[in-house]
C-alpha cells in the first residue's frame, strides 16, 4: 500500500503540473512567452526606460522607493574596504594593511575616483544603485589617466549611450546584440557606444557616431 500511495501521489503531482500549464480563467492574467529577455525588450527598451525615469521624477512612491533602496543598501558611509593581508606566518600585515586602506580612502574622495572629479566613491555607490533600479542597467567606463597620484578613474555613462539598435550576426560565430558584441559563448568583447548622448540637441553631428570600447574597460551591470 505504501508503494501504491507513493505512485498515486506522484501521478497527482504530475496532473497538477499539467493543469497549471493549461489556459483557464484562473491563469488568464499570466502573460506567457517563450522569447528571450533581450527579444522582449529590444524594441521597447528606450520607451520603458523613459517611463521609469518619469516615475522616478514625479511619482512620490517611486522616489521614496529609490531613497529607501540607496539608504538600506549603500548606507550613510557606503561600502568600505578593510584590508586583511597576511604574511607567510599567517599574521596580519598591520603596516601594509594600513597603507592599502589609506590609499583606498584617498582614492575614494571627491575629485580622485571619477574622471570629471564631481563624485566621491560613496556618491558613486549611491548613483549605481539608483541607476540600476531606475534604468535597469548601469554603464561604468574605466580610464587610466595621467594623474600621477590617482591614475585609475571611472566614468558613469547614461544607459542611453549604449546603442540598443545595433544588432548583427558575425561571421566568426559571435553576435552584436543591443550594442554589445559577444563571442560564440556570449562573452562580451566590445561595446558600441554613441560618441555623444543620442538625445542631446547640441551634438547632432556626432550623436549617431559610435565609439567601440573594449569590454575590459566597461562594467555593465543589469537586472536580468
Spans of features found by a protein language model:
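Structured, contiguous alpha/beta core segments that scaffold functional sites
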Residues: 2-68, 129-224
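Extended assembly-interface regions of large multimeric machines
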Residues: 32-35, 39-133
Amino acid at each position: 500500500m505504501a508503494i501504491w500511495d507513493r505512485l498515486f501521489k506522484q501521478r497527482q503531482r504530475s496532473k497538477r503540473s499539467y493543469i497549471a500549464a493549461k489556459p483557464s480563467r484562473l491563469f488568464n492574467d499570466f502573460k506567457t512567452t517563450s522569447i528571450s529577455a533581450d527579444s522582449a525588450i529590444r524594441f521597447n527598451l528606450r520607451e520603458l526606460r523613459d517611463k521609469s525615469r518619469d516615475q522616478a521624477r514625479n511619482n512620490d512612491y517611486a522616489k521614496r522607493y529609490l531613497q529607501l533602496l540607496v539608504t538600506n543598501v549603500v548606507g550613510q558611509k557606503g561600502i568600505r574596504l578593510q584590508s586583511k593581508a597576511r604574511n607567510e606566518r599567517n599574521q596580519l600585515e598591520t603596516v601594509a594593511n594600513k597603507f592599502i586602506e589609506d590609499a583606498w580612502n584617498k582614492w575614494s574622495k571627491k575629485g580622485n575616483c571619477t574622471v570629471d572629479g564631481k563624485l566621491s566613491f560613496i556618491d558613486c555607490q549611491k548613483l549605481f544603485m539608483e541607476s540600476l533600479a531606475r534604468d535597469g542597467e548601469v554603464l561604468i567606463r574605466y580610464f587610466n589617466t595621467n594623474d600621477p597620484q590617482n591614475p585609475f578613474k571611472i566614468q558613469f555613462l547614461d544607459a542611453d549611450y549604449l546603442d540598443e539598435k545595433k544588432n548583427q550576426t558575425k561571421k566568426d560565430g559571435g553576435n552584436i546584440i543591443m550594442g554589445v558584441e559577444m563571442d560564440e559563448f556570449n562573452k562580451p568583447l566590445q561595446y558600441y557606444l554613441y560618441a555623444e548622448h543620442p538625445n542631446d540637441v547640441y551634438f547632432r553631428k556626432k550623436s549617431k557616431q559610435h565609439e567601440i570600447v573594449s569590454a575590459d574597460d566597461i562594467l555593465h551591470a543589469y537586472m536580468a
